[in-house]
Design a protein with these regions (language model features):
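A detector of single, family-specific signature residues
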Residues: 1-139
Length: 139
């Protein structure tokens, strides 16, 4: 699948912060995004979805990430998030905003991982390479 669609490799690797290894792992784990319908499925499938430990009003536990996906992809995405904070303005802004709000740095880093995966999914769905200077026109 990976070598049959070089345009998919180009699209995924166009996202700032996603390298060759991460591109390969994401495409292999998702089988070329064949059964992924939205970015929430992608995040959950790769094991980076936040889950809350609650029971009604009596128990309020810490929010964790579900580790149902491959640990290898999770660790690679973690490293990509650290790289993206230096080079991807949207990721840097998200990280700084969450840390300034009082969130733990690891929580902010997982949010950056999810932001990267959202960007990857958007690029794959639209079939347009990532543009880090893109701004959404709001009317």
């Amino acid at each position: 699948m990976l070598f049959r669609s070089p345009e998919l490799v180009e699209l995924v690797s166009s996202v700032v912060g996603i390298g060759k290894r991460a591109t390969t792992e994401i495409i292999i784990h998702t089988n070329g995004f064949e059964n992924i319908d939205n970015y929430r499925q992608l995040i959950s499938f790769l094991g980076l979805a936040p889950i809350e430990n609650t029971s009604g009003t009596s128990i309020k536990g810490r929010t964790k990430i579900c580790k149902q996906g491959g640990g290898k992809v999770r660790s690679i995405m973690y490293m990509c998030a650290m790289n993206a904070m230096k080079n991807n303005p949207a990721c840097k802004e998200l990280y700084d905003r969450l840390v300034a709000k009082g969130k733990h740095k690891i929580v902010a880093l997982i949010a950056v991982c999810n932001k990267l995966l959202k960007q990857v999914f958007a690029v794959v769905q639209s079939k347009v390479a990532f543009d880090k200077n893109y701004t959404k026109n709001v009317a």
